[in-house]
Amino acid sequence: MDLQSLLAARVAADKPVRVGLIGAGKFGSMFLAQVPSIAGLDVAVIADLDPDRAKAACRSVGWDTARVARTRFAERGRDACLDERVEVIVEATGDPAAGIANAIEAIEAKKHTVMVNVEADALAGAFLARKARAANVIYSMAYGDQPALIAEMVDWARAAGFSVAAAGKGTKYLPAYHTVTPNAVWEHYGLSADEAKRAGMNAQMFNSFLDGTKSAIEMAAVANACRLDVPHDGLGFPSCGADDLASVLCPRPLGGVLAADGMVEVVSSIRRDGKPVERDLRWGVYVVFKARNDHAAACFKQYGLPTDATGRYAAMYKPYHLIGLELSISVLNVALRGEPTGSCRAWRGDAVAVAKRALKAGEMLDGEGGYTVYAKLIPAERSLALGALPIGLAHRVKLLRNVAAGEFVTAADVALDDNLRAVRIRREMETQARQMTQVLTAEQGAASSVFLQHSDVTRG
């Protein structure tokens, strides 16, 4: 990896990597803070619903007057996508429908796309990645966010000749968190509502981190990028610290918690009694890998890696991730090396809506981190069989029937707007998946999982 030399060549040629940023929120602002320190990287356009807020964000992260003045500010993502100077689009709105629309606009304009918007990727990454490949541009996860870091670790393990047993991240989790609502979220962060307000923290967004929704979305993205499996009935969130990864995240017959090798999972930084886990990974990412031969297993021991009881499972981890401060790694990879930092390759997992409480017909769902639903990660084939409603479509939609607490919300339970592009794309994905499953089953006697793993329709 020699991005610095490749970028220096661009500087020498007076051909900087020019970026269009859509969404100047927290993630985008962290990226903007680093741009002045990276010679050869230039943000030519910033699109935000509030351009004045975007300008203020630039000033707040240290941009000087001259840099702000030479940057184009716009209200529409389309303006960034169509700007002829732009080579890479960074989609950082956080809105699934907007993210899908912006990514399509960028791809059709022959721009590489770095998708910070993991909500959009979990909803329609297979469609977007396939469309990008057809257009001969790159569709990439965003480095700095946990899914891309996990994908990098999985790739490292496989390229080194190991098999991957598990990959994922850490978080703070208790089962009761699934039903927490925004009006009670701050007590779990040790903050008062006033403190959170002064810090500009959004209650619903931070609640999505707590109630399991963000974990489900991110692990769906990881499973789909790395062709890993997901638990049948949602993430287990085992309590586990860095030193115990290999012994906890191995198959059940070996004393671990996994149904099998090759799974995504999220570990909790606290035990079920609320006590902290030693050397927790609340902010980190990990991969558990398996030696394929006795010699490699012996080397684990010789070099001091903590392993499971068999000595064949070991782990690597990063204790932290730097979010937007690391985003330039993705931008430079796609522009200078023509490579994504993780990209959807299959449709293996789906983050779907589950009722937080008894819901009544006529109520409006309020999406991730809200008062009505949280997301559970399940296999894509199970989601298709249930007709489950993806969490990315569970915002501002009306319930047509009652749904009991803890039950899946299905697409038939809500009034989806067929005029929305995101709805049409999702339905197209589902229809193609069902049709191809039927073909494979009829022709090969194959299980639907064969399609979900290998077909061009779902590889994205």
Q: How should each PLM-predicted stretch be described?
A:
Residues 1-105:
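N-terminal glycine-/serine-/threonine-rich beta1-alpha1-beta2 phosphate-ribose binding loop
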Residues 444-459:
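Intrinsic disorder/low-complexity segments
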Residues 45, 89-91, 113-116, 139-142:
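Short catalytic-loop micro-motif centered on adjacent basic/acidic residues
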Residues 2-8, 188, 192-443:
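C-terminal catalytic/substrate-binding lobe primarily of soluble NAD(P)-dependent oxidoreductases
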Residues 140-210:
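Rossmann-like NAD(P)H-binding beta-loop-alpha module
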Residues 88, 95, 106-123:
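ADP-ribose/adenylate-binding Rossmann-like module
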Residues 49, 94, 118-121, 144-145, ...:
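Short, ordered loop/turn segments at secondary-structure junctions
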Residues 100-105, 118-137, 142-145:
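Rossmann-fold NAD(P)-binding glycine/threonine-rich loop
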